[in-house]
Amino acid sequence: MTSPLKRTLTRELPQHEGQTVKLQGFVHARRDLGGVQFLVLRDVTGVTQCVGSGLTLPLAESSVEVVGKVKAHPKAPGGFEVQVEDFRVISAATEATPVEIPKMEWNVNPETMLDYRVVTVRGLKERAALKVQAELVDAFRAHLRGEGFTEISTPKIVSAGAEGGANLFPIDYFGHPAYLAQSPQLYKQIMVGVFERVFEVAAVYRAEEHATSRHLNEYLSLDVEMGFIEDEEDVMGLENRLLASIMERLRATSQAEFELLGATIPDVPAHIPRITLMDARQLVTEKYGHPVGGKDLDPEAERLLSQHFAETEGSDFVFVTKYPRAARPFYAHPELNEDGSVNGEVTRGFDLLFRGIEITSGGQRIHDYGMLMDSIAAYKLKPESLEGYTEVFKYGMPPHGGFAIGAERLTAKLLGIANVRYARAFPRDRHRLTP
């Protein structure tokens, strides 16, 4: 029979010393020493030790109810234990878990961990990572609302890609070809004409056949777009403030999770260092002997560049600016020459590196209709496939720009998680559709 007492959470026990409380949660661990039974109960706020006699303990992960008196105990988790007066099994586990949830480190194949993700995600470290991400996303929303942004929701079934048609998942839309959205980019820009400052928190889909520790085919994208800017510096300034606000929130809400995972919350400089892509390539080549080819920085170059700024400026963050046109999509605003003419080689695009990995791409976008149509032609795209997007630029779009942060990448780097898949509850990569 359910106790009439109101439920108490484990984190509230210090407020109830000497009182009788009701706890509800999961059997995290158990020991039977003959006449005395020890039960570690886990709820959403933590774990606590419960001690009783004559108890028949169910299998681990069973959900249970404990009624008992709170007593200070220096060796118990959290410094308190509950002396059991009444015990009830709410829902019994029917078989042993494939891994021992209480273990802080599991010596099993990483793929096995994901195969049994519905259970392993209950682990304290796994739960902590997702809790940090939830706080991060909430802080993202709160800061942007404070700066006058409006949250929007854009289609995830689209007729064309935001980045030229590559890396799209095709679907059959009632007999018509369609795709899963790889980015809300085009809709974000359209909505600048409505709310001026917008953001979205939503999944995006990339049909990229990567098998790396930094890529997912479905991930949570934190997207921002703002109008009436001067140039990309306004956008980088916003992201600088946003990240500082997020870290401040994490210090207030998530210290326990960071301590559990052995991670530290970074300081965000008042002015995150900037370096142009060309200078970054030269620095990495000359200082570290790592030649950089292609149109972007490779992963090792990102790591070395981050190392340089951590050592020389004490910053875990660095903006890499002035990306070449070949490395940016058609809507990236070109740099202008001193005479005001268009520089056909360089854009006002940037990336943000954090602890050795890119977590953001952003920049100023083209807002002039003629320039946009010229860019679409230069990229050899079909104008008719983008008419729903380009139409709005006939009607006074302001200078605007924005960025997107990959929530899982940021979470993984914050917490020292080696593979981005473990920063998502149920990851999707090129080999995984379940659970």
UniProtKB/Swiss-Prot annotation:
This is Aspartate--tRNA(Asp/Asn) ligase. The gene is aspS2. Residues 185-188 are annotated as: Aspartate. Disulfide bonds: none annotated. Changing P77 to C/I/L/F/S/V: Seems not to be able to charge tRNA(Asn) in vivo, but Asp-tRNA(Asp) formation is not affected. GO terms for cellular component: aminoacyl-tRNA synthetase multienzyme complex; cytosol. Changing H28Q: Enhances enzyme specificity for tRNA(Asp) over tRNA(Asn). It comes from Deinococcus radiodurans (strain ATCC 13939 / DSM 20539 / JCM 16871 / CCUG 27074 / LMG 4051 / NBRC 15346 / NCIMB 9279 / VKM B-1422 / R1). CDD domains: Asp_Lys_Asn_RS_N, AsxRS_core. PROSITE patterns: AA_TRNA_LIGASE_II (PS50862). Gene3D superfamilies: Bira Bifunctional Protein, Domain 2, Nucleic acid-binding proteins. The record marks P77 as: Important for tRNA non-discrimination. Homodimer. Keywords: Aminoacyl-tRNA synthetase, ATP-binding, Cytoplasm, Ligase, Nucleotide-binding, Protein biosynthesis. InterPro entries: Aa-tRNA-synt_II, aa-tRNA-synth_II, aa-tRNA-synth_II/BPL/LPL, Asp-tRNA_synthase_2, Asp/Asn-tRNA-synth_IIb, NA-bd_OB-fold, NA-bd_OB_tRNA. It holds the Pfam family tRNA_anti-codon. It is found in: Cytoplasm. It catalyses: tRNA(Asx) + L-aspartate + ATP = L-aspartyl-tRNA(Asx) + AMP + diphosphate. One of its GO terms (molecular function) is ATP binding. ATP binds at R206, A207, E208, R214, H215, L216, E358, G406, A407, E408, R409. PANTHER family: ASPARTATE--TRNA LIGASE, CYTOPLASMIC, ASPARTYL-TRNA SYNTHETASE.
